[in-house]
């Protein structure tokens, strides 16, 4: 007999505004406990120093978490020019200090232009990437540095928001895998004075922005847990909120049954190939499909319909 899962079945997405000095996993576990949820996962860690958009997926929504991990992210950061640290942010020890040259807006824009578009970025030793199974930050804390391969990233937008020496405020829209700490440090190096991140706030992750977020609530007792749970439940978004970038297809009853059984179906007319959201004729989301070149639709990632009906 299968072991009964602890907690209540809960399906959906919640966007939490992560507070400073909390790890992403600690926030996830606190919210999961508040809701007594069976299954939950976050969609890309933020550094403890960072705040902002942290989407949490519950139950069947975890099937689509990789799409959020792979999505573009937007950040607003405050860089401190003239000082570099061991971790490239304010949590690290100071390595070096240099005078900040007189910089005009034109000077700054000229340098920022070098960091827009397709770039190669070497991940920081103070990151969660693993080397032979060990997170790099654990090696760094032991004074061990290993070679890291440069990774392809895209800086879609890099906007100068304000410059009040030594503070430089930037808005960054970037691809997955971009380390803002590294970006800021590299900008400081080109400016000739060094830099590190003082503040970092994620303002968007895929389709979700701060407007979708709920304030994180910590608690120390059962009454506090219940109050937090009520607040969180009010802001639980439907499973398909994380896949709104794809067009939708409404299936008739016969095609719904075929798709659920893993079969490919013929639907016409279809405008283009690629992933699509699949719904029953009663507007119930059942998962993602893919439109093939021959006009057929095959299931890609489907919900467990029985799990949804058990809620």
Curated annotation (Swiss-Prot):
SUPFAM superfamilies per UniProt: Pseudouridine synthase, PUA domain-like
Name of the protein in question: tRNA pseudouridine synthase B
Gene: truB
Family, similarity comment: Belongs to the pseudouridine synthase TruB family. Type 1 subfamily.
InterPro entries reported for this sequence: PsdUridine_synth_cat_dom_sf, PsdUridine_synth_N, PUA-like_sf, PUA_sf, tRNA_psdUridine_synth_TruB, tRNA_sdUridine_synth_fam1_C, TruB_C
Taxonomic path: Bacteria, Pseudomonadati, Pseudomonadota, Gammaproteobacteria, Oceanospirillales
Listed GO MF terms: RNA binding; tRNA pseudouridine(55) synthase activity
Keyword tRNA processing: yes
Gene3D superfamilies hit by this protein: Pseudouridine synthase (3.30.2350.10), PUA domain (2.30.130.10)
Swiss-Prot/TrEMBL keywords: Isomerase, tRNA processing
